[in-house]
């Protein structure tokens, strides 16, 4: 199967998980990216069953609304039973690198409210040690040079994210992203704490302190489920 076919497979598996485990009238938490988009599409026929969804990005909001979902502000919501999102990398403990799509801060906020984080990914995303995928760090613009120096001191090579048009990439929150390459992340929780303490960092795309509870992994043999 192609990577796109594997993504579609796990997206449908996530929809099946939600339908089996989330009560009617609940609010869904929805992530960002190509796999999350397929999950949104798979849930579209069942939108009337739920009170609405909390989205982690403007892009996901547009896709949800295009399917007729009610998109709620997180401040209006008391509880989210399940948050479904993809990952750029995930290890055997359920820790993840996220933020390749630029929505890491809102993803981390929505995930923190959810009772269960369901990660959906194709088999290539499961790794022994994270760091091959560049680690995204959302940064207040005025602090980007200072933060980059501190990230370099940690052993990484910081690179300011740019758009295809050559402009500085801006998040939905108006901040910039520094992608750090060359890291071998042996202690995800420790590195998450260290980077988040750098003044000017909004958040780092390490989801270790609040990792996945369930992984639905698309493989040639079908969808494998892992619980953490």
From Swiss-Prot:
Intrachain disulfide bonds: none
Pfam families: Rib_5-P_isom_A (PF06026)
UniProt: substrate binding residues: 32-35, 85-88, 98-101, 125
Active site: 107 (proton acceptor)
Key words of the record: Isomerase
Cross-referenced InterPro entries: NagB/RpiA_transferase-like, Ribose5P_isomerase_typA_subgr, Ribose5P_isomerase_type_A
EC number: 5.3.1.6
Reaction it catalyzes: aldehydo-D-ribose 5-phosphate = D-ribulose 5-phosphate
Annotated GO biological process: D-ribose metabolic process; pentose-phosphate shunt, non-oxidative branch
Any Gene Ontology CC annotation: cytosol
UniProt GO MF annotations: ribose-5-phosphate isomerase activity
Pathway in which the depicted protein is active: Carbohydrate degradation; pentose phosphate pathway; D-ribose 5-phosphate from D-ribulose 5-phosphate (non-oxidative stage): step 1/1
Family recorded in the similarity comment: Belongs to the ribose 5-phosphate isomerase family.
Subunit details: Homodimer.
Its job: Catalyzes the reversible conversion of ribose-5-phosphate to ribulose 5-phosphate.
Protein name: Ribose-5-phosphate isomerase A
The organism of origin for this protein: Ralstonia pickettii (strain 12J)
